[in-house]
């Protein structure tokens, strides 16, 4: 059975897309910790990020870097943090989170509640910065 992320890539489930190439896809986290919180995934359905081939893992990091630089332009911050957890969705993914402090990376923090219009605006700002 396809993961929710594979279904997003296939267009079966809507998302707020930020960027895409032939191997990778970036979209906003629907339960963001801060504005600009983005997920980067391989289009190939792989549960554990370290099960990706060396080439695909390296390429995913290069893609994530492009997205992170755009996030930093769209949402000025001290740094864009990166986290790989992968326990909730069995599909490898990288969280990219604009940070003003390390506290912005605490996944136990309350999540933002944003409207569809806010999500659309955020995704557009990041895409435009790419």
Residue ranges with predicted function:
Residues 1-130:
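HIT superfamily nucleotide-processing domains
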């Amino acid at each position: 059975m396809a993961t929710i992320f594979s279904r997003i890539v296939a267009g079966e489930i809507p998302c707020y897309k930020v960027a895409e190439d032939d191997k990778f896809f970036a979209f906003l986290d629907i339960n963001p910790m801060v504005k600009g919180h983005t997920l980067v995934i391989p289009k190939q359905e792989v549960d554990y990020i370290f099960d990706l081939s060396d080439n695909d893992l390296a390429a995913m990091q290069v893609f994530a870097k492009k997205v992170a630089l755009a996030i930093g332009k769209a949402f000025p911050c001290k740094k864009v943090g990166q986290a790989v957890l992968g326990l909730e969705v069995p599909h490898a993914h990288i969280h990219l989170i604009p940070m003003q402090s390390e506290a912005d990376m605490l996944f136990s923090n309350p999540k933002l509640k944003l409207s569809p219009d806010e999500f659309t605006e955020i995704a557009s700002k990041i895409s435009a910065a790419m």
